[in-house]
């Protein structure tokens, strides 16, 4: 099950669709038709539970007994698509939900009454997500929530609702419609709280924390590996120089303070500068050891 499906099923498992949720779903996923008996309404979804909720909502709010039809997509994913269809009281339903103008292109935005009411806005966002929303799986490490709209002004209305909840929503116009999106993990988690998907919010945060912890450990390990590599590289250069001095002039001819450092470096090529300093018969600072190693390298360069 994808993360998007998990979020939608959590929402649908909590309550029946509200008036404003129903309005958003029909506006974003509904299609009006005309038959000999009058107007028809079809609402299309790939979510079987949402189709069932729509059927129950039509019956509960309007005493409309709709049909649930389904077919298989012919694309690669071959998803099953559900259509909730009715030809009963469609005009009454559209009028009651203030959607009549939407389907005839006269009003493509969001009703001002919804934009100005927090609870109505919350419910509308929930319905909009159920209809056309998606969230990238947090396991991917790339956070994105999208709600697609047919009309740009509707997408902008969705953004306004999100911004009322202090979410950094943006709108992108596409060839076919527009999308309202969030990209910050914190905004996506807050959105899940807004629509009441608390379990999904906790799951999202858990995955996010695990990923960040793994990334921090990887960065620390990479830094440590790089430090070790630099230490070994510097150590091998010095060891080669010490071997050169030994072959040409003999280590015994080095100043006494350099002889001990040279011997220790040969015996312990993996030691850090601090470990070399701690191993000397007379304790020395790291800068002191570095100074002596530079002297040894200079002597070798001059041979």
Swiss-Prot record:
Pfam families the record matches: HTH_WhiA (PF02650), LAGLIDADG_WhiA (PF14527), WhiA_N (PF10298)
Gene Ontology biological process terms in this record: cell division; regulation of sporulation
InterPro entries: Homing_endonucl (IPR027434), Sporu_reg_WhiA_N_dom (IPR018478), Sporulation_regulator_WhiA (IPR003802), Sporulation_regulator_WhiA_C (IPR023054), WhiA_LAGLIDADG_dom (IPR039518)
Highest taxon of source: Bacteria
Keywords: Cell cycle, Cell division, DNA-binding
DNA-binding residues (ranges): 272-303
The keyword Cell cycle belongs to this UniProt entry's keyword annotation: yes
Molecular function terms, GO-annotated: DNA binding
PANTHER family: CELL DIVISION PROTEIN WHIA-RELATED
Family: Belongs to the WhiA family.
Function comment: Involved in cell division and chromosome segregation.
UniProt name for this protein: Probable cell division protein WhiA
Source species: Streptococcus pneumoniae (strain Hungary19A-6)
